[in-house]
């Protein structure tokens, strides 16, 4: 997820400032800071801000234990056949949506069909691609988005691999075996939607996104107040795990420094990402309420393939070699992040140190030789989202690139993460793009397929390599986790040669909370544990 990820399998976004009377809420409610979500429809939510809000409104089929194994939550059981191609999901009885509708298997079928149908333009559509019939729900615009021709209607509107056997039984047939498929079902895009979400078959009801109806422990109070807040309140008689607080205000910020000021002043209860400029003072400001914990975040910059100045691999290698990762993590992040020299996070099985090799080693002399030989561009820019804590490290990175390559480099801030993604999706000349990734599910594949596979949900730079795609798919179809990892490691080795992105840093959660709350934890997905946080009496 993009960060963000979200991601989704989520791109990691970072938090940004909002104004709200709710921020001073007392009683048994808490205020948590986020940036403006890009979307709140589950199948279109692939970044961390939206995913956090949806985690309060929905209850997933699975969650994950301490060893990252999937554990049924809304599901009673998830069982594959002998081929790992047909999966049967039994639902726990008694769950309802916030409007009183019972949660049945057909709700999952309808939501997933909507998410998978190409013309609906859902950002998480890729995650349904392993289900039989997905290809027939897609169509290709013959002359691109800018051309006058329109894409033809897909061959089908519904996945052949989805079947509601009865109200509590969902049968999923995959297009190929996938031994770890159950892990995907914990991701945001696999939430169910009620009948009320649709005005007709497959057509989303107008206004539903601003007043989401979920199946989770909290329900929306009012509507999504864009650039201000989303307020949720606890559901009475919820059949799943019950939170300790009665409500949450997701307060939306455009500036993470303003968010931190609210935290220190006691107007905000949790900030999941302390801004860089406040790291040095956070211990004094917050005491033991300044905390760190592992997360799955991977920070990188990508080279858009639609910008021809980056087409020579030597240009990409040179820029990577011009960056002193250790200096930035020590001096800018004060050790809160660590240099990344691989393309996946250390928290997942299959991680290997230094798969990037020499391309990720600081070597300004070799970088200059490569760049000059490739006739790299005289000017570079790194575009980032200003609603996250990125300016300081982007400026530091540009200074290193200037010194090593002798070219001008500037950081360009977009006000919101959503604005950055929109510009990239429209193929505007953004230069190098600041991106981050929080795993959607704990598999090595989640750092490969969505980010680099052809048509991947967060492959914003447009990278495509047939051999890479085949290896990722071969890993999915492998009979054992060990065989899968071997294939995925081969795929990662291709990235190390072609450098479609530059690995920069591995994250950890660096968060803080107010005196009003306790039992605050932030997990590998960069989400606050909404079931354990509580108000201090």
Where in the sequence are the language-model features?
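N-terminal lobe/hinge region of extracytoplasmic solute-binding protein
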Residues: 33-82, 113, 213
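Ligand/substrate-recognition segments at binding pockets and active sites
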Residues: 227, 372-439, 481
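Alpha-helical secondary-structure segments
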Residues: 104-113, 167-173, 177, 217, ...
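Gly/Pro-rich hinge or "lid" segments in bacterial periplasmic/extracellular proteins
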Residues: 146-149, 157, 167-168, 174-243, ...
């Amino acid at each position: 997820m993009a960060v963000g990820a979200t991601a989704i399998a989520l791109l990691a976004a970072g938090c940004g400032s909002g104004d709200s009377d709710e921020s001073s809420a007392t009683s048994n409610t808490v205020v948590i800071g986020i940036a403006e979500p890009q979307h709140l429809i589950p199948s279109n939510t692939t970044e961390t801000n939206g995913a956090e809000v949806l985690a309060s409104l929905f209850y997933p089929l699975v969650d994950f234990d301490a060893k990252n194994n999937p554990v049924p939550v809304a599901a009673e059981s998830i069982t594959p056949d002998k081929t790992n191609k047909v999966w049967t999901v039994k639902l726990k009885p008694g769950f309802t949506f916030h409007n009183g509708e019972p949660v049945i298997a057909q709700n999952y079928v309808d939501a997933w069909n909507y998410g998978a149908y190409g013309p609906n333009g859902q950002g998480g559509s890729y995650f349904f691609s392993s289900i039989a019939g997905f290809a027939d729900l897609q169509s290709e615009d013959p002359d691109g988005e800018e051309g006058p021709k329109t894409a033809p209607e897909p061959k089908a509107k519904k996945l052949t691999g989805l079947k509601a056997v009865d109200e509590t039984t969902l049968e999923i047939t995959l297009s190929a075996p996938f031994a770890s498929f159950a892990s995907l079902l914990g991701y945001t895009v696999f939430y169910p939607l009620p009948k009320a979400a649709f005005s007709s078959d497959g057509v989303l009801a107008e206004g539903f996104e601003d007043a989401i109806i979920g199946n989770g422990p909290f329900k929306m109070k009012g509507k999504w107040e864009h650039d201000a807040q989303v307020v949720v309140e606890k559901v009475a008689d919820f059949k799943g795990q019950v939170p300790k607080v009665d409500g949450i205000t997701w307060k939306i910020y455009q500036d993470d420094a303003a968010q931190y000021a609210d935290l220190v002043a006691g107007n905000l209860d949790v900030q999941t990402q302390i801004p860089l400029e406040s790291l040095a003072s956070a211990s004094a400001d917050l005491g033991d309420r300044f905390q760190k914990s592992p997360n799955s975040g991977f920070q990188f910059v990508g080279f858009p393939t639609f910008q021809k100045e980056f087409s020579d691999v030597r240009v990409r290698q040179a820029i990577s070699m011009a960056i002193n990762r250790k200096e930035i993590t020590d001096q800018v992040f004060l050790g809160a992040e660590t240099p990344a020299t691989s393309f996946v996070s250390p928290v997942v099985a299959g991680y290997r140190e230094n798969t990037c090799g020499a391309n990720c080693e600081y070597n300004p002399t070799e970088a200059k030789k490569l760049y000059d030989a490739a006739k790299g561009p005289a000017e570079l820019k790194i575009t980032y989202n200003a609603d996250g804590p990125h300016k300081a490290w982007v400026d530091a990175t540009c200074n290193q690139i200037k010194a090593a390559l002798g070219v001008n480099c500037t950081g360009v801030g977009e006000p919101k993460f959503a604005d950055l993604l929109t510009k990239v999706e429209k193929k505007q000349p953004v230069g190098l793009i600041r991106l981050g990734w929080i795993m959607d599910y704990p598999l090595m594949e989640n750092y490969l397929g969505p980010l680099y596979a052809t048509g991947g949900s967060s492959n914003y730079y447009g990278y495509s390599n047939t051999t890479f795609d085949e290896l990722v798919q071969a890993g999915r179809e492998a009979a054992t986790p060990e065989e899968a990892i071997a294939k995925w490691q081969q795929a990662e080795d291709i990235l190390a040669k072609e450098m479609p992105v530059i690995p920069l840093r591995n994250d950890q959660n660096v968060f803080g909370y107010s005196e009003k709350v306790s039992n605050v934890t932030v997990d590998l997905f960069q989400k606050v544990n909404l079931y354990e946080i509580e108000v201090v009496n």
